[in-house]
A protein has these predicted regions:
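Short, flexible turn/loop "capping" segments at secondary-structure junctions
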Residues: 1-6, 60-63
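Active-site-flanking beta-strand signature of metal-NTP-handling nucleotidyl enzymes
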Residues: 5-15, 68-70
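Short amphipathic alpha-helical segments
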Residues: 18-51, 89-96
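Short amphipathic alpha-helices within nucleic acid-binding modules
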Residues: 20-22, 74-86
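Histidine-centered active-site/metal-ligand motif
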Residues: 29, 82, 117
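Short, glycine- and small/hydrophobic-rich beta-strand elements in well-ordered beta-sheets
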Residues: 33-68, 101-105
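Short, well-ordered, aromatic-rich surface patches in folded extracellular/luminal domains
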Residues: 85, 89, 98-105
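Acidic/histidine-enriched, glycine/proline-rich intrinsically disordered or flexible terminal extensions
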Residues: 102-120
């Protein structure tokens, strides 16, 4: 389905008391993406997913939560456009995004990767 496309994926690990902020960040970013990104052509955003759930380590819940963002683009031009738009007309978050990130236990940011297998 998305084989040979480009993917951006971020993971934030945070304490449960930040869950409302995490949900608002996902909502605000999705709204901005809907207003600014195209569904067609070289820069097409093909898929946007946010997920939230407990963090597990060695099969056990850690007490932390995870927020995962996955964006799939037609090619690298879409990812490049995404970051350019973020700099030029960045998303308006209701919460201080930098403050949220500073309170996270861990953050993993993969700005671009090649999708090597995809189903349905």
């Amino acid at each position: 389905m998305f084989q040979n496309k480009k993917q951006l994926q971020y993971l934030w690990i945070f304490k449960p008391e930040l869950i409302d902020i995490a949900n608002r960040i996902a909502e605000d970013h999705t709204k901005w993406m809907n207003e600014t990104h195209t569904k067609e052509g070289d820069k097409a955003l093909l898929m946007l997913n946010w997920s939230i759930g407990p963090e597990f380590k060695d099969g056990n819940k850690t007490g932390n939560m995870s927020l995962i963002l996955t964006e799939v683009y037609e090619n690298q031009a879409g990812i490049d456009d995404h970051f350019q738009q973020a700099q030029n007309n960045g998303a308006a978050f209701r919460d201080d995004f930098s403050d949220f990130e500073s309170k996270c236990e861990n953050i993993v940011k993969i700005n671009t990767s090649d999708i090597i297998h995809s189903m349905w």
